[in-house]
């Protein structure tokens, strides 16, 4: 699970930040600040450019599956192949993030999933077009337009109500899944078909999806 969502940060590596500046990243920054506000933008800046105690990028690159591995996963047939529903409450989502989130499902190496999006932005025509586009192209992408924003809790409940799967996962509207995320979940379920809940590690990724940072590696449950 990968998130672009901000959290509190420490000192900023200014040299690293200035090296990343370009007309493209500056425009991205202004769009982010306009959508989320200056406070969240500042938190995001700290989060993105604070120094890491242990460099995560090299570790991540060493463990991500190769294209050959992903292709092998796509061909694998499991004895137990449950439908997995991913519920997403969406409100005024930047369409770039919306596309990235949907496409992270479409490229999953495990194919028995459905994406249940509740759109609480009835006046956002860009979101409407993107949702209609993906839904028309892939029947696993489903969405429901609300007449008004009911708040994050009720929007989420409406997304859960759409779900038909044996297992239901929740994503924020600007989250992503690694391409092998659902495969790894279903692989574990082969040995634990009676499991009631599963959880995964997560990290954060740049808007361009080219650099991962701030991992949250969770311990075994006890």
PLM region spans:
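N-proximal low-complexity "stem/linker" segments adjacent to membrane-targeting elements
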Residues: 31-106
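Short alpha-helix within the catalytic core of nucleotide-sugar-dependent glycosyltransferases
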Residues: 99-103, 128, 157, 165, ...
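Acidic donor-binding segment of Leloir-type glycosyltransferases
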Residues: 106-148
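Glycine-rich, basic loop-to-helix element that forms the pyrophosphate-binding segment
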Residues: 146-163
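A recurrent flexible, glycine/aromatic-enriched loop bordering the glycosyltransferase active site
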Residues: 153, 161, 211-222
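Short aromatic/hydrophobic "clamp" motif used to bind/position activated sugar donors
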Residues: 168
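The conserved acidic donor/metal-binding loop of glycosyltransferases
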Residues: 172-176, 201
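Conserved donor NDP-sugar-binding/catalytic core segment of glycosyltransferases
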Residues: 180-214
């Amino acid at each position: 699970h990968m998130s672009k969502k901000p959290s509190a940060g420490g000192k900023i590596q200014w040299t690293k930040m200035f090296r990343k500046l370009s007309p493209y990243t500056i425009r991205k920054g202004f769009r982010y600040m306009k959508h989320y506000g200056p406070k969240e933008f500042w938190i995001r800046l700290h989060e993105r450019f604070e120094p890491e105690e242990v460099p995560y990028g090299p570790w991540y690159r060493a463990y991500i599956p190769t294209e050959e591995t992903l292709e092998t996963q796509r061909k694998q047939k499991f004895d137990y192949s449950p439908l997995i529903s991913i519920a997403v409450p969406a409100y005024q989502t930047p369409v770039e993030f919306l596309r990235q989130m949907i496409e992270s499902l479409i490229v999953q190496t495990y194919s028995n999933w459905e994406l249940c999006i509740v759109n609480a932005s009835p006046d956002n025509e860009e979101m409407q077009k993107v949702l209609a586009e993906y839904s028309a192209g892939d029947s696993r992408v489903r969405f429901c337009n609300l007449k008004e924003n009911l708040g994050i809790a009720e929007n989420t409940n409406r997304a859960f109500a759409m779900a038909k799967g044996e297992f239901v996962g929740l994503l924020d509207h600007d989250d992503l899944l690694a391409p092998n995320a659902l495969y790894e979940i279903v692989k574990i379920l082969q040995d634990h078909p009676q499991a009631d809940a599963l959880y995964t590690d997560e990290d954060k990724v740049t808007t361009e999806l080219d650099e991962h940072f701030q991992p949250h590696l969770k311990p075994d449950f006890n």
